Amino acid sequence: ISKRKKIIKNYFYNDNFYRNLLKKKKNNRLKSEYSKIKKYKKMIKFVYQDSPKGTGDAVLRCKNLINSKYFLMLMPDDLIINNNCSHSLIKLHNKFNSSIIASRKVNKKNVSRWGIFKIKKINKRNFLINDVVEKPSIKSAPSNYAVIGRYILPKKIFRILRKQKPGLNNEIHITDAIRTLILQKDKFIGHIFAGKYLDCGSMKGYINSSLKISKI
């Protein structure tokens, strides 16, 4: 995160705020949520990015926190409800012993907003990823299967990111590093997840997503 975005860290560590709020409100739901925050904040580590240099740069800064051969990565502006997508990816990883990336079909008119896969179908919900392109034009897009922000990636991707040159918008993209591994014949499986997808990557998307969740 950016050092300027203190609100994210305060969400987990501002204990006085929560204690005072619970004294005033005496709300069981708030009490339950605060209990969850206390439980999980012990597991959370914060890594700072000095300037927005892309997702690849942000991931590279977490290198020293990863000890296993593979790791699970989530993009917080891609929200998936009514299904545990991460659990599904882990099951597939154990089955195929490979990297797994969540995907969904998008309107062909909107492919330039996404990373897009070139695929070879395995079954109804899974496909082999032969290539991935970051935000292609409609004409150059290899499909309309988009990258969604749930990944199981190999630790060796850090080696690629360390040497990677900036791409689109002069940023280091995780998609470009994944593409390098695919071209080196690393196996990547795409998974069309169950559940409802909510895009929180824009102010409009965030507000719409909040309204939808409030009705659940």
What are these regions (language model features)?
Residues I8, Y18-K23, L30-I119, R162-Q164:
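Conserved beta-loop-beta/alpha segment of the NTase-like Rossmann-fold superfamily
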Residues K26, I80-I81, T175, K196:
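Residue-level signal for alpha-helical context at structural boundaries
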Residues L72, S86, I90, I122-L198, ...:
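Catalytic-core segments of class I nucleotidyltransferases/pyrophosphorylases
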Residues I1-K3:
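Short beta-strand/loop segment that forms part of the nucleotide-sugar
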